Swiss-Prot record:
Protein name per UniProt: Gamma-glutamylcyclotransferase 2-3
Recorded family membership: Belongs to the gamma-glutamylcyclotransferase family.
Catalytic activity: glutathione = L-cysteinylglycine + 5-oxo-L-proline
Active-site residues, as the UniProt record annotates them: E86 (proton acceptor)
Cofactor needs: Mn(2+)
Signal sequence, start to end: none
GO biological process, one term: glutathione catabolic process
Enzyme Commission no: 4.3.2.7
Gene source species: Arabidopsis thaliana
Lineage: Eukaryota, Viridiplantae, Streptophyta, Embryophyta, Tracheophyta
Manner of cofactor binding, per the entry note: Binds 2 Mn(2+) ions per subunit.
CDD domains: GGCT_like (cd06661)
Any one Gene Ontology cellular component term annotated for this protein: cytosol
InterPro entries in UniProt: ChaC, GGCT-like, GGCT-like_sf
One Pfam family named in its UniProt record: ChaC
Length: 199
């Protein structure tokens, strides 16, 4: 029996395990939010980054990619990889996955999804909601073993666009981060010019 894994964050562009088939599509009743703190990939314990998790939202969908794994050895390798990679995500759910918005039946029933819950007892890295500008400022500054937090956001934005998916939260956040970075560059240019004039 095949195992299916749904990716809605970095798994979209960086899978890290063998798979036999990938399907772009969506799950129902959830939305993607930057509410999870990352202290091991895109931030540190002293300054966490922010990565995506899922939040229940009755009328919404979350787009991503489902990966099919059939060989027993590949299943074991995938689970070992995911249990380490997603160790800060405290819930595993098995949800229906759709590829057609008009379909009443799922394309795949029971895709495995890792979710970081808002339960502080089981997930002490949960950061929760915050104003868009505050989240953007945190993402601009955060950096971890897997690289700058902003790269995670921009990679997610690009990966979704390549699949033809739109996610307003991701787009708005990426635009806010770009705005902060452009303002910072302008300040650096002004400071450099002022220093040159004083020489």
């Amino acid at each position: 029996m095949a195992m299916w894994v749904f990716g809605y964050g970095s798994l979209i562009w960086k899978t890290g395990f063998p798979f036999d088939e990938s399907l772009p599509g969506f799950i129902k009743g959830y939305r993607r939010v930057f509410h999870q703190g990352s202290t091991d990939h895109r931030g540190t314990p002293d300054f966490p980054g922010r990565t995506v998790t899922l939040e229940a939202a009755h009328e919404e969908v979350c787009c991503g990619v489902a990966y099919k794994i059939t060989k027993e050895e590949d299943k074991r390798d995938a689970l070992l990889h995911l249990e380490v990679r997603e160790k800060q995500y405290d819930q595993k759910e098995y949800l229906d996955f759709f590829t057609d918005s008009n379909a009443s039946e799922p394309a795949v029933a029971g895709v495995m999804v890792y979710i970081a819950s808002p339960d502080k007892k089981s997930n002490n890295n949960y950061l929760g909601p915050a104003p868009l500008e505050d989240i953007a400022k945190q993402i601009v500054k955060a950096k971890g073993p897997s690289g700058p937090n902003r790269d995670y956001l921009f990679n997610l934005e690009e990966a979704l666009a390549q699949l033809g998916f739109k996610d307003k939260h991701v787009t708005d956040l990426a635009n806010q981060v770009r705005h902060i970075l452009s303002e910072s560059e302008e300040l650096d240019i002004d400071a450099t010019a002022a220093t040159a004039n004083n020489v």
